[in-house]
Curated annotation (Swiss-Prot):
Amino-acid positions noted as binding Mg(2+) in the UniProt annotation, renumbered to this chain: 247, 249
The protein, known as: Translation initiation factor eIF2 assembly protein
Main localisation: cytoplasm
Origin superkingdom: Eukaryota
Organism of origin: Xenopus tropicalis
Amino acid sequence: MKKEQVLNCQFSQWYPRFKKLSIRSVVIPLPENVKDYLLDDGTLVVSGREESPGCSQRDLNSTAEDEVQWSDDENTATLKAPEFPEFSIKVQEAINSLGGSVFPKLNWSSPRDAYWIALNSSLKCQTLSDIFLLFKSSDFVTHDFTQPFIYCADDSPDPNIKYELVLRKWCELIPGAEFRCFVKENNLIGISQRDYTQYYDHISKQKEEIRKSIQYFFQEHIQYNFPDEDFVFDVYKDSQGKIWLIDFNPFGEVTDSLLFTWDELRRSWNLSDVENEEQDCPTFRYTNSEVTVQPSPFLSYRLPKDFVDLSTGEDAHKLIDFLKLNRNEQDEDSD
């Protein structure tokens, strides 16, 4: 895998070409100070919105959760979350233009490993503070920032990356309708059930129809239209049978191979299964009823140090920020 292949899978690189096949999205350049904040281990969240000037009744009635001060014998310091007013306005305008709820991601990754920390246990975001909470809790997002070329074989200097916040219109996608597709030398060699930890009866019953519809979609819209010969793409098959393009990923270890192994994907001649007699038909792997349902691969991400600090009170700054976020959400609901 080469660095150029990783760069080609950035959302803003492929979305303009395949826009009509995918979910409506908005891309916003990520300011350097926002990137620094997301990588900072200090403050957990920010308000994500500008407060109106003047003194309101809520200001007068603010509790210890709203104005927290740390004092010693000689001085007093006020804990204040950082603000990004211009960026916040752009983000909120984009969210509103996409219907009020979005699915956020960076150039490559979404914070799928951090969904559990959100108040709604979902990646559905309506404010910048929702996005910040997920991003600062996600190892996947941190990887985008710090190790995007970790598995690349070329020794050339790492290219300069212009980081972007990607906001996708929120859609209620059924996990059992998502599939990952593996392409080698511009040939679709394998399809895997995306949520392989669960058994879905409809996949078993419709396996041939699913395989053929994805292969047709690939041949009509994707094949020879992506800059690389080897790549991975994700699709969603809706209730009407329409295939939607969700994402592109590099062909290599940085991408989860799901029900395949990377060794067999590289040796594509070794993929054929008993049921697949057509030479040019991709191998389709899915979880069948005989296989024991597996735990979610994201379970290992559910107890980061930030969460332990919150639960034990060892990091007072993060605890106060979390309380502030809850208070802000409650105040907005009452407005």
